[in-house]
């Protein structure tokens, strides 16, 4: 994965810089997300791994994407195809999203709770995280009954484990040491 990120970084950075220059960050994010989905399609995978000429591969890829990809996006696809890098489009899209979130001072937080969180609870978590991180927070909520009760919040390198399962695990570790 680190190798894919290293390969994808220059493409993502160039696309992001261009998107800022053109004031089209959101449309580029949508375009790259769509192109990444196309590259991950099971029908497209063998073509990306195959020996199809780069110009034919780029033309095929662009025709599949259709109007979802503008002229500048098509140029990026052509350059990536020439360099045999279309298979890293998902990593390019992910890095682009990270650059966009950093630029917009936004962060995504994964919140796993034992039970479904109410909208009020989600709002309280969001407000607390926004104060702590000094960024706008978008929550991705899911449930896991194995937590027993409480929540686990993950964003970037920060992990807040407020679950009963986590507390029991830490207590067990203390008792065993």
From Swiss-Prot:
Gene Ontology MF terms: proton-transporting ATP synthase activity, rotational mechanism
PROSITE patterns linked to this entry: ATPASE_DELTA
Write down the Pfam families for this protein, in alphabetical order: OSCP (PF00213)
| Record localization | Cell inner membrane
In this entry, which stretches build a coiled coil?
none
Assigned keywords, A-Z: ATP synthesis, Cell inner membrane, Cell membrane, CF(1), Hydrogen ion transport, Ion transport, Membrane, Transport
Q: Name one GO cellular component term.
A: proton-transporting ATP synthase complex
How does this chain sit within the bilayer?
Peripheral membrane protein
| Top-level taxon of the source organism | Bacteria
Main location as per UniProt: membrane
Q: Look up the signal peptide feature and give its range.
A: none
Task: Name the InterPro entries for this protein.
Answer: ATP_synth_OSCP/delta_N_sf, ATPase_OSCP/d_CS, ATPase_OSCP/dsu
> Which HAMAP family is this protein grouped with?
ATP_synth_delta_bact
Q: How does it assemble?
A: F-type ATPases have 2 components, F(1) - the catalytic core - and F(0) - the membrane proton channel. F(1) has five subunits: alpha(3), beta(3), gamma(1), delta(1), epsilon(1). F(0) has three main subunits: a(1), b(2) and c(10-14). The alpha and beta chains form an alternating ring which encloses part of the gamma chain. F(1) is attached to F(0) by a central stalk formed by the gamma and epsilon chains, while a peripheral stalk is formed by the delta and b chains.
Described purpose of this protein according to its UniProt entry = F(1)F(0) ATP synthase produces ATP from ADP in the presence of a proton or sodium gradient. F-type ATPases consist of two structural domains, F(1) containing the extramembraneous catalytic core and F(0) containing the membrane proton channel, linked together by a central stalk and a peripheral stalk. During catalysis, ATP synthesis in the catalytic domain of F(1) is coupled via a rotary mechanism of the central stalk subunits to proton translocation. This protein is part of the stalk that links CF(0) to CF(1). It either transmits conformational changes from CF(0) to CF(1) or is implicated in proton conduction.
Q: Which family does it belong to?
A: Belongs to the ATPase delta chain family.
Name recorded for this polypeptide: ATP synthase subunit delta
